Curated annotation (Swiss-Prot):
Originating organism: Wigglesworthia glossinidia brevipalpis
PROSITE patterns noted in UniProt: RIBOSOMAL_L9 (PS00651)
Record NCBIfam families: L9
Example GO molecular function: structural constituent of ribosome
Lineage of source species: Bacteria, Pseudomonadati, Pseudomonadota, Gammaproteobacteria, Enterobacterales
Keywords: Ribonucleoprotein, Ribosomal protein, RNA-binding, rRNA-binding
PANTHER family: 50S RIBOSOMAL PROTEIN L9
Listed SUPFAM superfamilies: L9 N-domain-like (SSF55658), Ribosomal protein L9 C-domain (SSF55653)
The protein's name: Large ribosomal subunit protein bL9
Biological role stated in the UniProt entry: Binds to the 23S rRNA.
Length: 150
C-alpha cells in the first residue's frame, strides 16, 4: 500500500515521503494515529499544500524542545529536604515525582519518563547525580542534594 507520511518515522521516512508499507500496518497503526494518509492523486495535491504547514510545525516543536532542554541544562543542582536517621539513611526514599516537584518550583516543565535514576530511588543524605534525557541526543546531568531537615 502506498502512503504519504505526515510525521517523521525512524527507519521509514520523513514528512511528505511516499513509501510502501503493508496494509495492516497502515490501517491499524499509521492511519488511526494520523501519521500517514493514502497516496491517491487527491491526497498528493492536498498534501503539497499541507506539507509547508507540517514542516513549520515540526521546526517549531524542535525549537520548543531545544529551549526546554536549555532550561533544564541551566539547572545545576536542586536541594530537597527530607527526614533521615542519624546515619544518613532516609525514612522512605526520593523518587522521580519528588524531583519533578522541585524542578517545577523553578518553573521548568519535565516529565517522569525523562528522569533516569540509575540506582533506583535515592535513599541516603548527600549529593546524587541524576540524568535527564529529553530526547535521544539531548541528555544532561543535574545534582540532587538531599539534606536532613531535623
Amino acid at each position: 500500500m502506498q502512503i504519504i507520511l505526515l510525521k517523521k518515522i525512524i527507519n521509514k521516512g520523513n514528512i511528505g515521503d511516499k513509501i510502501k508499507v503493508k496494509a495492516g500496518y497502515a490501517r491499524n497503526f499509521l492511519f488511526p494515529k494520523k501519521i500517514a494518509i493514502i497516496a491517491s492523486e487527491k491526497n498528493l495535491k492536498f498534501f503539497e499544500k499541507k506539507r509547508k504547514i507540517l514542516e513549520e510545525q515540526s521546526k517549531y516543536e524542535n525549537f520548543k524542545l531545544k529551549e526546554r532542554f536549555r532550561n533544564i541544562k541551566s539547572l545545576k543542582e536542586i536541594e530537597i529536604y527530607c527526614k533521615a536517621g542519624s546515619k544518613g539513611k532516609l525514612f522512605g526514599s526520593i523518587g522521580a515525582n519528588h524531583i519533578i516537584e522541585k524542578i517545577k518550583e523553578r518553573g521548568i516543565r519535565i516529565m517522569k519518563n525523562e528522569i533516569k535514576l540509575t540506582n533506583g530511588p535515592l535513599k541516603t543524605i548527600g549529593k546524587h547525580n541524576i540524568k535527564i534525557k529529553v530526547k535521544s541526543n539531548m541528555c544532561t546531568e543535574i545534582c540532587v542534594i538531599l539534606k536532613n531537615n531535623i
